[in-house]
Amino acid sequence: MMTNGAKTLYDKVFEAHIVHQDESGSCLLYIDRHLVHEVTSPQAFEGLKTAGRPVRRTDCTLATVDHNIPTESRRHFRNTESFIKEADSRLQVQTLEQNVKDFHVPYLGMSDERQGIVHIIGPEQGFTLPGTTVVCGDSHTSTHGAFGALAFGIGTSEVEHVLATQTVIQSKSKNMRIHVEGSLSPGITSKDLILHIIGVIGTAGGTGCVIEFTGQAIQELTMEARMSMCNMAIEAGARAGMIQPDETTFEYLKGRPLAPTGAEWEKAVTYWKTLKTDEDAVFDISVTVKGADIRPTITWGTSPQDALPIDAAVPDPANVSDPIKRSGMEAALEYMGLEPNTLLKDIKIDKVFIGSCTNARIEDLRAAAAVVDGHRIAPTVKRAMVVPGSGLVKKQAEAEGLDKIFEAAGFEWREAGCSMCLGMNPDILGPKERCASTSNRNFEGRQGRLSRTHLMSPAMAAAAGIMGHFVDIREFEFKESSAPKVEVRHDTDSSTLEEANYGHAKEEPPSAELSDVAKQEKVNDIPVSNSSTQSPGSAPSADAGLQPFLQLQGIAAPLDKANVDTDAIIPKQFLKTIKRTGLKEGLFYDWRFAKHADGKVTGTDFVLNREPYRKATTLVVTGPNFGCGSSREHAPWALKDFGIMCIIAPSFGDIFYNNSFKNGLLPIRLPQDVIKEKLYPIASAGGELVIDLPAQQIADGEGHILVTQFDVEPSRKHCLVNGLDDIGLTLQKERFIADYEAMRRRDFSFLEGGSKLLPRISHSKPTSMPQAANDW
């Protein structure tokens, strides 16, 4: 798949990592950096244990905990057993602790000052480098593309594949460029810019593509701002987002713990300077936006594409002609509790969340602190939280006095973790609570059942907390105070970070009391399972192989929706498992079941709750972008558990599409008009469809051919038809992998060592964790 002539940045990085390419064009890519966390790794490590396989490159692997850990004070942290109260969360963390011990994987646990959100600690430590391939079982791995890395999220099956082979099977994506002309206006951030872009192209605008962000405004961004941009490329449907590395990149990386040094640094920079798109390279898709047009931007609905400038009003569905879009808008407004034509600045909020892998770096905290300095949160705001992205960010912020400014303003100052971004931990919203959030997704139920999330920049979220409603940051009154002066700096000097003490000056105040409703939500949002009776490492293994997919005949269920995200397919509370099975109940849980005020849960009239669709084997979806959102492989696991083995839609989220094949499911892309005219009527009538994979045809229950030829990549078809194990097939190419590694040691020696270079820190917090868990 070598590109002749002019190449894009993506072309260059992709081609530099090809280990082997088959006749169909499918490539085996070498992975330079693999980040691991507690939610998407248990089943992967169990697969290794079952097969007796080691982790091939522990030096290219770095693990941490972030998704479901509490963010309350760790001043008296002793161990995971006593600190994490929720049994299923505790089990996942303990399972990771055992796995990193068993497989000798470098690990930054809760007792380590360097622990934090996985996409913050990678760059922070210099583990992320330009021109590398970076993967993680998390969709926001695209964050690392800010360094000119090819970084993308993978599912659990691919996590296992990378652990075992240090490679991943990939097909080349299309090239997309988003060019930002001119500079951003004062007060406008990269969060405003990326929300505006997603609002323009939609959440499916980048499907099948790797986006390169270019232009003057991009070049002028700090590294932390660039990371926020690439972080949300996935919300535009892209496989990854990339920015050309430059002097800003090199300055950020130089001197970080895992970055090259000496002659290796010079060798690396010489190579990194070649990582730029050639002038005459051709992009498949190009979009241009003007930097001067960007205003402070927030979301109003239940998708990141529902983004508008702060001086706009809530849209009116009556002005939309497309019936699917109009219906989706009406549903979003009902869920969000908003009336059409309401000014965004008139919308009142209940809570504020400043954090997440999008906006929890030191630059973000400085910007928010500058806003709240000298103010107090509005009396109508129930809770305002600031959650640093890592222990080191927290240290640096405390050294600058930011924690005191936040606390004086009424904000809670928390420990590092994903926190309220996805509500897998105790930090959640109560039903119908409205939050000004710096996170990356505003899906239904993302921050708690019936939660209402509005995305925005840290400064905008902080200002909303002070005023009690959304405000235009350009009109906000900044105050001087007697608190330590906050300088909103634009550098990323790590000297303070290196010198700061980890210990707190005093015991942190307890968290604000949750309302009765929120307490109830905290308990009841997590389905009861028997996982708490298991011990770490006892997860059932993956199937030894997949059942061959030849012909599938059965009931087809209709679903007339667009942008069905993975949070809707399987809500976050069902991710707290170390198994691949038992997820049938969680499939479309919030659509299939209703929770009443008395706590009772009853079934709805959702299609899969009705006959004959309770036994559906195929799902026929009319709208595009099915499976958009997170990398959770739990989505295809839940579909498979229910009995659905084929999904037909106009388009799919890239990660979901890939995860489906890994689990023996067949996702079929067809034109929307073909689905609506030929397949949807049969599904609506409770009829059957026959999916013939060898022939690549679709027929009705009586054998009449409806689709004479659907497309499926030859390599994927071969694996499905034969029920083949990807890892076993890849290990047959050991010679090619070994040859690539020999070349890598010679030509890219600055990548060697990786996480094995991570030093132990003598002043990390004491812990009763077994020494071997941190023994690198």
UniProtKB/Swiss-Prot annotation:
Return the broad EC class: lyase
Q: What cofactor requirement does the entry state?
A: [4Fe-4S] cluster
A Pfam family for this UniProt protein?
Answer: Aconitase_C
Q: In which pathway does it act?
A: Amino-acid biosynthesis; L-leucine biosynthesis; L-leucine from 3-methyl-2-oxobutanoate: step 2/4
* Binding of [4Fe-4S] cluster, residues: 357, 418, 421
Q: Does the keyword Iron apply?
A: yes
**Gene Ontology MF terms:** 3-isopropylmalate dehydratase activity; 4 iron, 4 sulfur cluster binding; metal ion binding
PROSITE patterns documented for this protein: ACONITASE_1, ACONITASE_2
Q: What are the protein's UniProt keywords?
A: 4Fe-4S, Amino-acid biosynthesis, Branched-chain amino acid biosynthesis, Iron, Iron-sulfur, Leucine biosynthesis, Lyase, Metal-binding
Segments for region (Disordered):
482-518, 525-544
Which residue windows does the record flag with biased composition (Polar residues)? Answer: 527-538
**What PANTHER family does this protein map onto?**
3-ISOPROPYLMALATE DEHYDRATASE, HOMOACONITASE, MITOCHONDRIAL-RELATED
Q: Subunit notes for this chain?
A: Monomer.
Name of the molecule in the record:
3-isopropylmalate dehydratase
